[in-house]
Every structure is written in C-alpha cells, then in structure tokens.
Amino acid sequence: MYKKSGQLYYSPTDLTSFMESPFASWMDRFSIEHADKAPGKDPADELMSALADKGYAQEELQQSAFIQQGKTLLSIKGASTDDKYQNTLDAMAKGFDVIVQAHLQLGQFAGYADFLVKVVHSDGDQPSLLGNWHYEVWDVKLANLVRPSFVVQLCSYSEMLASMQGVLPEFMAIVLGSGNKERLRTSEYYSYYKTLKSSFTDKQDAFRADLRPDPADSKSWGDWSGYAKQILLDRDHLFQIAGITIGQIKKLNRAGIETMQQLGESSLEHTSGLQPEVIKRLIAQAKIQRASGGRDVPLFEILSPPQGEITGLALLPPLSPLDVFFDIEGYPLDKGGLEYLWGNTYFDEAGNRQFIDFWAHDQEQEKQCFQDFIAWVYQRWQQDPSMHIYHYANYEIAACQKLMNRYGVCEHEVDQLLRNNVFVDLYKIVKGGLLLGEPRYSIKNVERLYRQKRGTEVASGGESIIVYERWRELHRLGEQGDTYQTSQILRDIRDYNIDDCDSTQELVDWLRLQQEKHVIPFFGKIDVSEPEVPEEITDRIRLRDRLLLRSLAEREKEPVKASLAENLAYCLEFHRRESKPIFWRLYDRRGQSHVELRDDLDCLAHCTRTEREAFKPTARARNLAYEYCFDATQEFKGAQKQFYLLGIETDSGQSAKVTFKSEESDLANGLIVLQSKDEPPSIISLVPDEYVNPNPIPQAIDQIVRGYEDGNLIYGQSAILDFLARAKPRITSHRDGPIAPSQDPDQRLQQITKAIANLDHSYLTIQGPP
C-alpha cells in the first residue's frame, strides 16, 4: 500500500497480507500514517531476494514460450502509473495476444499482472468492450503447488481487468515452478475473494493507530517479525515454549494461562482438548526453559520411555565401527530442487574421523551422486548389518525417497535400508528422550550441550542456499571452479557441511553416554528382514530390463520405437513404485508415539474402550465390534475403512488391524466403533491403512507389454502404441486436416462419430466437459 496525493492505494499483495496476518497488515498501514513512530522493518532477506530474481527469470521463460508459439506481445512501459494504465488500455483495444506487465486499477486498488492473455470469443458469446475478445490474467509462480494467496491475487487482478474490458474473465491461470499450468474457474473463488476484500476495506476505513492487533493471533508477521517477537517476549508469551502449537496456546489461554511463568508454575492436569501427558510435557518444558535463562549451557533432563512404548533413547542403536553421520545441503531454487552436497563423517580402520562427500550441480550429476552415496552406505551395511546412518530431522530421508522416485534407481537398496531402520533420525530420539531448556530442538540448539559455538564462514542452512546461489552466478561467469578444490565458495560450504556431520557424530556420542548413564536399553530392530518378492514381480523386472536394453539398441536408428520400449518398461513398475510412499508413511507413523499421532489428521490417538458390550454390527457378522471414546476436539478425517493398531501385533506377529464402522460411530461426540477378529486392548491409537490394491491393472499392463515384446503388438497397427507414440490417429478414408471441422454441434457430433467408427486400429482423444 502507498499514499498518492493524500489517497491510499492498495495492491493484491495487501489483501493476501491481511488474509495471512492482520497484525502485518495493520503494521503496514501504521508505518504509512505514522512513519516517525513506526519500528524498523525486518532486515532485507537475501533468500527472498534470490527468490524474486528466480521469479523474474521464470517470467522471462514464459514470455519466451509465448514468442515461440507465434503470439504477438507488448510489454507495457510508461513514465507514470497513469501512462502505464492508458498504455494497457490501448494494447487491449489493439488486441495483442499477450500483454506483459499490464497496469490494472479499480478504485483504490492497482497492480501489475504478469501477463494478460487474449481469449477470442466463440459464436454467440457476449462481446466485451473490446469486441469479440477479452483478456484473462496469467501469473507466474516459483511454487509447485497452488496456494490460497495466489488465487486471491488473481481474483483481484481479474476484478480490475473486468472494469477495463466489461467482462469478468471466465478463467485465470497460474504457471507453476514445475512448468505446469493451472487454469482456475474465476466464479469458484470470486465470492470468497469479495468477502475478504470487504473485510480488508472495512478494517482500513476503521483504522485506528491505538488499536494494534495482537501478533499472537496471526500465524505470520510479514516484514515485522522481529518487532512482533519482541512484543510477545516482553509479555512472556507462550509462543516461546519449544514445540507448542497455536491450538495448544489457545486451549491454555482458555484455562487462564497466558505466560510461560504461569504455565511453569501451574498445577493444571486437565483442560478441554489437551491430553494430560501433553499438559505435563508443556509445563515441564516451560519450567526448564525459564530455569535455563542466562546460562551458557542450558539445563536438560533425560526422559525414560513410557511403559510399553519404544521412544527416545530406547531408539538409539549400539555403536558400529562402520556407522555414518550424514547431512545434505540442498538448493530449493532449482526446478524440483537440487540436492547438491551429500556429506558423511565416518571412522577409518584406525579409528580416525574422516569425511567423504558427493557433489552434484545439475540433475544428471544428482542422479549419479545419489547412486554413489547409496552404493557406498549399502556396501557398508552389507559388511556390518549393525551399522546405521545417523541424520537430524527428516530432510535426508525425504531427499532419498524423492530421488529414488525421480530417477527410478536404487529402489531395492533404499527399500532395504528403510525397512531395516538403518537410517536413524536423531531428532526423534532427542524430542522423545530429552527435555531441553531451549526454545527449539534444532541441532544448533541441542549442540550447546556438547560443543562450542561454531566458527565456519557459512552459518546456517538458509545462508548456504544464498552462498550456493552466489557460486552458481560466478561459475556461469567463469570466475569459480566447480569443485571445492577450485572454488573458495564451495570450500566454505563444504566446511559448513563437515561441521554439521561432525556435530551429528558428537551428538550420537553424547546421547550414548546418557543412554548408558540412565540404563536405557536399545529396543529397536536388530534382525535383518528380506522382503519376499513374488515370482510375478521378478518376472516383471526381467521384462523391464529387457525392454530398456532394447530401447538403448533402437535409440539411434528407430527413436520412436526406442521411446515406446522405454515407456512400456517403466509402465510395468508404475503401481509398485507408486505404492512405496504409502508404505514409507505407514512405517513413519508406526514409529511415532501416541502423543505425536494426535497432530496427524488421518490418525486417531488415545481411544479408550467404553462400557458398552462388544456386539455384532449385523446378524451375519463373524467378528465383534467394540466401542471406544476419544477427545472430540482431536481433528480426525475418518477417511479410511481399515486401521492398524499402533504397537499391537497378532499372535502370528502381524500388525493388528481393525475395521472402522462409520454407521455405528459418532465422531462428532467422540465415539468410534471398530470391528476386529481379536479383542483390541482397552487403550489404542489408530494408524490408517491407505494402500489400495491396484489389481488387475498391473496384470493388464503386463499382458500388453509382453504382447509388444513377443511381436503381437506392432507399431502402426495398434491403438495403444499409437497413443504412447503420440501418433496422428489413423482414420480410414480420412486425409490430413481437421477431423470434425463443423462448428454446428449436431453436425460436429456426427463427424466425430463417423471418425470413431472408421478408426484403423488407432485412437481418438475426446475433450469432454469439465
């Protein structure tokens, strides 16, 4: 927002700021009205600047794409906003295909749209003020998913555009960082937008400098986060307690607890919406943080695992001389992200600490880097099955899973390492086994217990992104080499990564000392489990490999056939590959505590058996149903029919499962009915079984692919091969040109029907209604 000639003007970004943070929106207005009294904004964020530069580059790519499509473009220029507005109107009237950086305005709202794209009207469409065309707004974003703020901005631009052309565009579009284009129907979001805009303008009209919104009521603080945090710290606000959520703060507030001191001194045991063990943990956390204030080394307390649960230090495996301490440096500003440095601390045969690193500066190198890392750690695990790979938080595991899916490599090895719990997340161990007098449980906070402050040139993961971006720019100019031996910047990043890996190793040593001191045995997985691979799957893998070899052989002389063989080969593994993330998520959930599952909307924690007798839900039912009660304030989707019981196994060693009987349950009032072959325990937590059996689709794909390998499916004589090769449809007696050229709906339908009837072992794509 800004003032011009005493008049306030707003942008679509002001609306999204208000939507996400009433506090930040108020502060923006206050800084305009009372600049002399306003606190300083947050310092410029180098990462945000880098993201902005990437955004401009993304817009240029889209602009180039329009040019390659043969569209006429005009980029709006002008000495003033009034000039730019008039030039935009002139460009719209002249009918350019694409207008770049169009200046739009309506009343007190104004802004620049990345692109206005021309839409030519069909016969019978209502004309706009421009004639038989109008424009729709396209916005370019780096994100890979559509966010609510993007949609609000587009609606605002579309409303301004409607005032200029007389027609509200039917669609608006977002070009995402992945390259995908999302077209959104304006009418589906417009009512929400108008309501939001009305609330925003009402607040602006009623603005008072003495009525600042409480920063605690906003999830973010925009450019004023430093000021907001100081306000809350001055109030001793609950937000500073490690691990506390906004929902928990609100529930504690309703119980009369507003400050960290009040919570630390509280004897509260029960309040609506919070489990007693959660309250107990929050009180203990508040106490130890207050007691640690001003200390060089924070206080800590070791937590023994609750009865019947394997948490905290009980998850820390014994020492192996082949252990690896692992950390990745990632660069999220590339499309899809780039995991560019895989660092590992380990010990050689003489017991000396060593470091090995794998680097990648593009996707081809990333694939090789991933394969090299997995091959190295897998060989060490084969040599000693008691060896583990230690990392802090989930980033490293997520990266391995992402790259395995992206490149289709190392599937067996990653599966085996995950299945046998070779990766050990130290964050889970610390969070479950340690009470720490710090406001966060990041490794930078935890390492205050066992090492001195760092002295590396690169200070944080966020800073490493900026430093690596700087290296990429200098490397493009030929001023930096592409190895740490030829680049000081890469050497600094490597030093930071070594420090991270060494810190991870030192944390394991420190945790192991605490484990021994408090006599907490390891209860994790010891035996190596090999998956039973059905003969059907091994046959499929052999077929895949034969087709990939065939694709390589045909690549130069018959590229179409080579592409067909490659596509068919990867189709064979599609369903098995797609099921892996489901099982990984299941393993992750089954490794969590009852308390942790409470925050998962697909799970249901702490269900307690009611006094209702077990019963048969139907006269013909073979298994009994059991009623449980749970805290109705716990958010639960109830989307699955089958659930695993956390930590419970059957007599045969299988994970116990139950069936959710929705018709017998009353979730709104905290009652759920579960059907089971065996009687479940009196207290249970539910983990969803999200696997959907794809059969018989994989078998049908097998049949098609085997037919291709055996020569029964021939390119040029098969509809499915035509489709995979993107070949033009073969239609008997049809020459080149439109298949259904008529604009008359009835005649066009007849032409389409005739074309389908005359298909010659080919296909025809039909665009149906939305």
Features from the language model and the residues they span:
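Metal-dependent nuclease catalytic cores that hydrolyze phosphodiester bonds in DNA/RNA
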Residues: 1-121
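Accessory interdomain/linker segments of ATP-dependent helicases and helicase-like nucleic-acid enzymes
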Residues: 20, 29, 33-71, 522-639, ...
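Conserved DEDDh/DEDDy metal-dependent 3′-5′ exonuclease domain
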Residues: 81-82, 95-106, 110-121, 131-205, ...
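Acidic, Mg2+-coordinating catalytic module of metal-dependent nucleases/exonucleases
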Residues: 171-240, 246, 255, 438, ...
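Pre-ATPase regulatory/linker segments immediately N-terminal to the P-loop/RecA-like helicase/translocase core
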Residues: 176, 189-203, 472, 476-480, ...
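Compact, charge-rich alpha-helical regulatory domains located at protein termini
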Residues: 226-300
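A contiguous, basic/glycine-rich beta-loop/short-helix subdomain that forms a polymer-engagement track
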Residues: 283-323, 328-329, 615
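Hydrophobic anchor at the beta1->P-loop junction of P-loop NTPases
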Residues: 766
